[in-house]
Amino acid sequence: MARFMVERTFPDGLEIPPTEQGAQACMSVVGTNAELGVTWVHSYVTEDHKKTFCIYDAPSPDAIRNAAKLNQLPAEKITAVRVLDPYFYLAAEVR
């Protein structure tokens, strides 16, 4: 499964309340994604809540686009990414 970063813009800001309603909204997205083999790993949200950078595992960018459409979420840019972990290099020095 490939990993992707999805950039989304919310002109009015994204507000997900820390309530049961907010949890249900998130779990609805998770459920719809799962039907398409897409896993939402986590998201970064800008301070003004108008932009998110979401990390996903998915079979393809098209699967993410389809999930976004079903969830009525924007998906302006989808980029394949890989982890660059500085601690990996520290461990390599020890070997």
Where in the sequence are the language-model features?
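Short S/T/G/P-rich N-terminal loop/turn motif that feeds into the first structured element of a domain
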Residues: M1-A34, T39-V41, T46, K50, ...
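Short alpha-helix boundary/capping motifs
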Residues: A23, D57-A58
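An amphipathic, aromatic/His-enriched active-site/gating alpha helix that lines ligand/cofactor pockets
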Residues: A58-L84
